[in-house]
Amino acid sequence: MDLSIVIPVYNEVESIQELTEWIVRVCTMNKLSYEIILVDDGSSDGSWERIISMAGNNNCVKGCRFRRNYGKAAAIHTGFGEASGEVVITMDSDLQDSPDEIPELYKMIITDGYDLVSGWKKKRYDPFIKRITSKFYNGTARWASGIKLHDFNCGLKAYRLEVVKSIEVFGEMHRYIPMLAKEAGFRRIGEKIVEHHARKYGVTKYGLDRFVKGYLDLLTVGFITRFGKSPMHLFGSLGTLMFLIGFSMAGYLGVRKLVFVAHHLKAPLVTSSPFFFIGLTVMIIGSLLFLTGFLGELINRNSSERNSYLIREKVNI
């Protein structure tokens, strides 16, 4: 199979049929074999019933329904698990991403040899606040990752199948899939300017809470890519350093006390110096950081599968 197209769906009953028909038309015209995987992320507006109806008319349309809303990353991860096409393409379900971009994205993976191609919505039709926060966040993500993409959060991306089977997407980390792919060893990452449409139906799901969550997940993915396999490398090093600093401060006060005593001088109480309590506090914090790293190692080595979602039903899968 040439293509697997993964589409997270959350209360987009007005748009998903139009989007699906558009994708079918593009794939048919370009002689691409395909499957369309629609993951219903707990919709309550009849989106699932629409998916069932479309799947009944076309076996290439497949659906998966969560029991509740888990978020976009969960839907993408589940879609990746079901995908079997040589190239996997993700896009949003609100008709703001154009299926007409599919053939060129497919070509960039198959012919040009990219592992991942990210869309760049150079001309956007989003609310002003979303455009501003997006520029700020993309600049930070570029600086943190070293990946020269202009639009990390663009929903329209293409992947080699091996890429999506090698990464784990959770939280709000769908924004940072290029970073996860790079860390997994897939370094041929390209970018394509794509057409962006104004929202045709419904209202945007974007809010400032997603902006905050996105930044927190940027910190998370940065930590995971560097220390996820061995948190002791970070916490153990910091803990040991802080413990040694605190011990040195307390040790200095102790040695000074002994020198005074050896010279038969009246020595001040060790506990009368604020440095004693500062040193003691730093030692305690260092010990706690070390224990945090140790516990992180235990959890990392014994944790069960983190991406476990309750699936209510499937169709054509």
Protein language model features and the residues they cover:
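Cell-envelope/extracellular polymer assembly enzymes that use nucleotide-activated donors
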Residues: 2-4, 35
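Short, well-formed alpha-helical segments that are part of the catalytic scaffolds
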Residues: 12-27
